[in-house]
């Protein structure tokens, strides 16, 4: 039945949901890549859709910005609508010089300055890692497409406008591939409620060089990332 944030019924969502931050990107993904699409959520403008990809039922829904927002939607999808796997498909900022604009990054894990996972984990550090099979399937899907992806750690920040830019030096030293705002939270929710999660990002801006993509490009492109996510679902079904 409907929750405070999702006005759908059991069965409206597939067992796998792709989740971009921007609900308009969710609409673009549904209209561009899925067939037989129907809208399944519009509460607070957080659009959700269900359709098929090569005959496989898949849903796509926005999750908003930041760990608190994405945690609400991920939790309700898992506990109230039977979702088993969440693939976040979003954007990230690069801090390393060898990571370039529009590179695709598959997050094996996510560091964070948020305390949300510590609240879940009795004030201890929780290693927010992606599901191994989902990660491997995404890497294999990228190889099949001929897309060179980066695989490693992300950093999920609580603040978009950080007061401590020196932290970027620390991230670079530790090999962080991209800075975003949700991966660690989605992994934590998935672990708490018995689901699986993965984050795939496209580099939308470079924190060091100042290069950036446009808002329109972020909303309506990044197709390699989406196709990798969708194809990885099919590989998971055939495993």
Curated annotation (Swiss-Prot):
GO biological process terms, semicolon-separated: purine nucleoside catabolic process
EC number: 2.4.2.1
Signal peptide annotation: none
Molecular function terms, GO-annotated: purine-nucleoside phosphorylase activity
SS bonds (residue pairs): none
Keyword Glycosyltransferase: yes
Organism domain of life: Bacteria
EC class (word): transferase
InterPro entries hit by this protein: DeoD-type (IPR004402), Nucleoside_phosphorylase_CS (IPR018016), Nucleoside_phosphorylase_d (IPR000845), Nucleoside_phosphorylase_sf (IPR035994)
Binding residues for phosphate: 21, 25, 44, 88-91
Pfam families: PNP_UDP_1
Site location (Important for catalytic activity): 218
Reactions it catalyzes: a purine D-ribonucleoside + phosphate = a purine nucleobase + alpha-D-ribose 1-phosphate; a purine 2'-deoxy-D-ribonucleoside + phosphate = a purine nucleobase + 2-deoxy-alpha-D-ribose 1-phosphate
Entry keywords, A to Z: Glycosyltransferase, Transferase
Any one cellular-component term (Gene Ontology): cytosol
List of catalytic residues: 205 (proton donor)
CDD domains to which the protein is assigned, alphabetical: PNP_EcPNPI-like
Binding site for a purine D-ribonucleoside: 5, 180-182, 204-205
Entry function: Catalyzes the reversible phosphorolytic breakdown of the N-glycosidic bond in the beta-(deoxy)ribonucleoside molecules, with the formation of the corresponding free purine bases and pentose-1-phosphate.
Known partners and oligomeric status: Homohexamer; trimer of homodimers.
UniProt family annotation: Belongs to the PNP/UDP phosphorylase family.
Record PANTHER family: PURINE NUCLEOSIDE PHOSPHORYLASE DEOD-TYPE, URIDINE PHOSPHORYLASE
Name of this protein: Purine nucleoside phosphorylase DeoD-type
């Amino acid at each position: 039945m409907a929750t405070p944030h999702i006005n759908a019924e059991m069965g409206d969502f597939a067992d796998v949901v792709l989740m971009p931050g921007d609900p308009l990107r969710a609409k673009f993904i549904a209209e561009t890549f899925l067939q037989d699409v129907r809208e399944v959520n519009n509460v607070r403008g957080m659009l959700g859709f269900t359709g098929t990809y090569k005959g496989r039922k898949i849903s796509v829904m926005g999750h908003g910005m930041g760990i608190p927002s994405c945690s609400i939607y991920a939790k309700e999808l898992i506990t109230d609508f039977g979702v088993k796997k969440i693939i976040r498909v979003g954007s990230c900022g690069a801090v390393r010089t060898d990571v370039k604009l529009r590179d695709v990054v598959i997050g094996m894990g996510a560091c964070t300055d948020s305390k949300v996972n510590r609240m879940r984990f009795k004030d201890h550090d929780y290693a927010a890692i992606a599901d191994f099979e989902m990660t491997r399937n995404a890497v294999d899907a990228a190889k099949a497409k001929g897309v060179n992806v980066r695989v490693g750690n992300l950093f999920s920040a609580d603040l978009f406008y950080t007061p401590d830019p020196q932290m970027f030096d620390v991230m670079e030293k530790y090999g962080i591939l991209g800075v975003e705002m949700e991966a660690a939270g989605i992994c934590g929710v998935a672990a708490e409620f018995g689901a699986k999660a993965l984050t795939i990002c496209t580099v939308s801006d470079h924190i060091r060089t100042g290069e950036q993509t446009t808002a329109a490009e972020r909303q309506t492109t990044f197709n390699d990332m989406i196709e990798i996510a969708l194809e990885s679902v099919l590989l998971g079904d055939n495993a």
